[in-house]
């Protein structure tokens, strides 16, 4: 076999082998999957490296899920965007509704949606997981803080828990105990992200730490906005 080099060519060869292993033969769908893979590699480096631990036949489908989530998240969170919150909401609504409609009919011409629809069809992933995700993305455009953990959980379920639920059919676990475990893992990752990204979230005008939990430590949103790491913040 001819060696694949330089590096960019080698990556394309690896991607082609993964698509072959996954049984994805349609050229347009392969291009859509490759677009999703590049999104994963460029924007989710740790997630991308994690996919390399999976069998090659699984990787394109995971990239498709990432591509969908990343595209929606970029509409909402691109700090360089000149769009208003309402314009973002309109764009997300149109794109999300279009992808959901494509899932319903089993075909998409969207550059990201085509790989997603193929993945959903092959693995019979429930559409409500994607509806919940889009709902949480819309919340990011209107909700800037959460009074209680119960309030926050609605957002966390849609933005993180359902990602695990989307993954389970692809991973083909031995029993259904994987489903609640996937939810718990997604929630845990998201809560860790909230703790890590307080400053970044403030830049976007949001606080994900529940206000009732801040109050238990004598803190308010205003304390976080000072960007000072006090003993109370550490606690």
Outline where the language-model segments fall:
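Acidic catalytic motifs of isoprenoid enzymes
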Residues: 4-235
